[in-house]
Structures are given as C-alpha cells and as structure tokens.
Amino acid sequence: LQIIAGDLTLDSHREAILQWVDSQWGGIDVLVNNAGIGAIGRFDEATQDRLRQVMEVDFFAPVELTRLCLPWLRKGNRAAILNVGSVLAHRAVPNKSEYCAAKFAIRGWSESLRVELAKEGIDVLMLSPSTTRSEFFDSLVDTNPQEKSRSVGSMSSDRVAQLAVSALVRSKREMILSVGGRALVWAGRLFPRLTDRLLSRFA
C-alpha cells in the first residue's frame, strides 16, 4: 500500500498523481473516486464559498480525475470506475443542501458516463453509503462545532470498503448500502409529500 497526499482540486496535483501511478504500475484498472467534504447548516446562513468548496471537492475533482484516467482505463484489465456517492444522492435532506447537490450531480454524471463507456467495456458503478464512521466529520466546511458533534456514523469505513470491493467484483451498477438508506429513498419515491413533511421537522 502506498499513499500519495495531494489536493485533487488542482490540475497540477491530479496530473502529478497520474504520472506517479504510470511510472510505478504503467496503467490503471480501477479508479475509486472517494475524496469528499461536507457541510451542515441552513443554505440561507451559508457563505458562497461553502457551496463552491463542496462542489469542487465532491464533484469537479472526481470528474476531472476520471477524465485524466480514461486513456489508462481504456487499456486496463476489467476496467471500472467506482464513484462513492451517498444516500443523499437519491433523496435530499435539510441542512445539507450543498452536499446533496454535489452527490446528485455525481449520480447523474455516473449514469450518463456508464452508458457512454458501456461499449468500451468500462464499468461505471455508484456506491451510496449512509453516514459512515470516519474522519469525514473532522473537515466539515463552514459548520457549527455543535453540528459536528451530532454527526454519528452508522457504518464503519471498513464495512463500506468491503461492500465497495463486492460491488466491483459483481459489477453492481448501483448499491445503496444500508437498510435505513434504502427506506429513506423508497419513502421519498412513494410518499414524497409525507417524506418532505417529516424531514422538515429537522430543518
């Protein structure tokens, strides 16, 4: 295992990482887009920078990294792109509007890219975990510390990683990982007005 630190929002850092990967392994079979940040708080109380930061890291960075990786993936063995989204890519909730917007964007882009690359044999998969126990909440943008302390993950990062490997092995186009997540998504689809009313209690 080798780790390279870098800012994926910068073109130069993305290119440097790809050059290093090419020098070490000469190609890419699987790209996992998992870098992300979030924010908690009402939209009307947030700064413009909060939305831009979240979108840069959670949407534009993985999109542009994927663009750079495509030449290698086209030559890869059972090539796949795994985009780590969220349950909130399927059903938005209050006080996380920027994060929901970024994850909805990732999901839409993934669906389009999946069809575009299908004939080339490159799988595009979408993994949608619920809240995960990780250092994610240590880097929330423009968020009240009290909100951070209330953010408790329901699934370990190790378990999410295991399910990600399973999705890759099975070429599972989309996985919502938790029972609670699937319940929220289906409630939003079947009973949208009721779901809105229930969620508004947390706004």
PLM feature spans:
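The beta1-alpha1 cofactor-binding region of Rossmann-like NAD(H)/NADP(H)-dependent oxidoreductases
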Residues: 5-16, 48
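A glycine-rich helix->loop->beta "capping" turn
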Residues: 20-31, 39
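Substrate-binding pocket helix/loop in short-chain dehydrogenase/reductase
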Residues: 42-43, 47-52
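Active-site loop immediately N-terminal to the catalytic Tyr-X3-Lys motif
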Residues: 44, 93-97
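Active-site helix of classical SDR
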Residues: 66, 102
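Residue(s) in the substrate-gating loop at a strand-loop-helix junction
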Residues: 86
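SDR active-site lid
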Residues: 119-179, 197
